[in-house]
Amino acid sequence: MLQEIDIKSLKGKSKVVRLKIKPDSERLPIKKPNWIRIKHVASQKVEQLKKTLRSQKLFTVCEEAQCPNLSECFNHGAATFMIMGQICTRRCPFCDVAHGKPKALDVDEPKHLANTIKKMQLKYVVITSVDRDDLRDGGAQHFKTCIDNIRLSTPKVKIEILTPDFRGRIDKVLEVFKSCSPNVFNHNLETVPSLYQKVRPGANYNYSLRLLKAFKQQHPFVITKSGLMLGVGESEKQVINVLKDLRKHNVDMLTLGQYLQPSKHHLAVEAYIHPNQFDKYKKIALKLGFSQVASGPMVRSSYHADLQIKGELIS
């Protein structure tokens, strides 16, 4: 219980207090339109999955970031595992993951993760992490160790990794993954470049693009993927320019979803994007050459990732 209280104290107001561009906690939120549908499904299966994760000292980004699709995914036995702890070294104001000084890496985590995936009989897994700017390789080696353990335990499972930007350590990342690769390498740009200081402080738009391209050059047969959250102040032209940049950097798959504010202390929603606009972006993206596009208000980067890779309709 103490751990839970500590984690909560590192979220919300305390997380964003030192940001140069602070969210306005007194601002009245925009009313949610009827197309924003959050499914709350309470079931024994959801509780059992949570119990399994806690027993192995594992966490999911679904829980830590308050994903609106948590109940639906958990009820179907799907989860995006979050490695390297619950505490992030960044203060992104859109995200509800805690900020602070992280603990040392759990050397048993890769083994626990592999055992859990085998126990759950998963065929497709997504692994993400907090930012670990305190580590020399940003946590790349830990990602690799997790992949190696999963491959040994469940050889046929497909693995997607949703990575941080590793703080500009491209050479270290490429060296670590030289002899080991996931099925999908996912790194989200999150927003348009002009909004980075407000939305994604500490990150660099061009570096993220270079990371995606460099990984694709090293592993041409690995699918590369990226995503944006919309409704934080971007224009249609800016979004289309980002899509063009992603294609220029050989990114294969795309996800587009609506940003939802986790609390009044987080970044405010500037607009709720109509489903028709998401459909328009999808058509444009496919014309630009993306192999698969998931675009809709409730789409998230790892939401039904196994279906996304098959090109099945996600909205």
UniProtKB/Swiss-Prot annotation:
This is Lipoyl synthase. It catalyses: [[Fe-S] cluster scaffold protein carrying a second [4Fe-4S](2+) cluster] + N(6)-octanoyl-L-lysyl-[protein] + 2 oxidized [2Fe-2S]-[ferredoxin] + 2 S-adenosyl-L-methionine + 4 H(+) = [[Fe-S] cluster scaffold protein] + N(6)-[(R)-dihydrolipoyl]-L-lysyl-[protein] + 4 Fe(3+) + 2 hydrogen sulfide + 2 5'-deoxyadenosine + 2 L-methionine + 2 reduced [2Fe-2S]-[ferredoxin]. It is found in: Cytoplasm. Binds 2 [4Fe-4S] clusters per subunit. One cluster is coordinated with 3 cysteines and an exchangeable S-adenosyl-L-methionine. Pfam families: Radical_SAM (PF04055). The keyword Cytoplasm applies. Coiled coil: none annotated. It comes from the Bacteria. [4Fe-4S] cluster 1 binds at C62, C67, C73, S302. One of its GO terms (cellular component) is cytoplasm. GO terms for molecular function: 4 iron, 4 sulfur cluster binding; lipoate synthase activity; metal ion binding. NCBIfam families: lipA, PRK05481.1, PRK12928.1. [4Fe-4S] cluster 2 binds at C88, C92, C95. Residues 74-291 form the Radical SAM core domain. Pathway: Protein modification; protein lipoylation via endogenous pathway; protein N(6)-(lipoyl)lysine from octanoyl-[acyl-carrier-protein]: step 2/2.
